[in-house]
Amino acid sequence: MAAQFPAQSPNQTGLAPAPRLPIDMLHLAKQALGDPGLELEVLRLFDEVVRVNVLRLEEATSAPDVLRHLHTIRGASVGVGAWGLAQHAHIMEVELRDGAEVNVEHIQDIRISAEEVRAFIAERIAAAPDYAD
């Protein structure tokens, strides 16, 4: 499976750039209008959306249920800039809409990507100053 958004790609010097973060923080900053407190709140909400929908995805028993959770994961991921997770969900969503069977390996890929994103969020929240005023 070719990656649409590779984590690394050679630049003009032939050297690969640093690995991409699980969340594009520039995109998130733009979405939160540059408000660091709002960024953290968005990350907290996104973390819960991902947690719940990955769990429901793993428990889903029908293709429509799987599609609904994939679509939610993809949409939420695009909103915060979690491009890798969005890509995994998008690929599986397209395959299912094209008539493929539910692929357990793709669900595992989504779970692994979600765990990476959630760990990144936990680190960001733990390291953040208190913005409550």
Spans of features found by a protein language model:
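Two-component system phosphorelay core
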Residues: 1-133
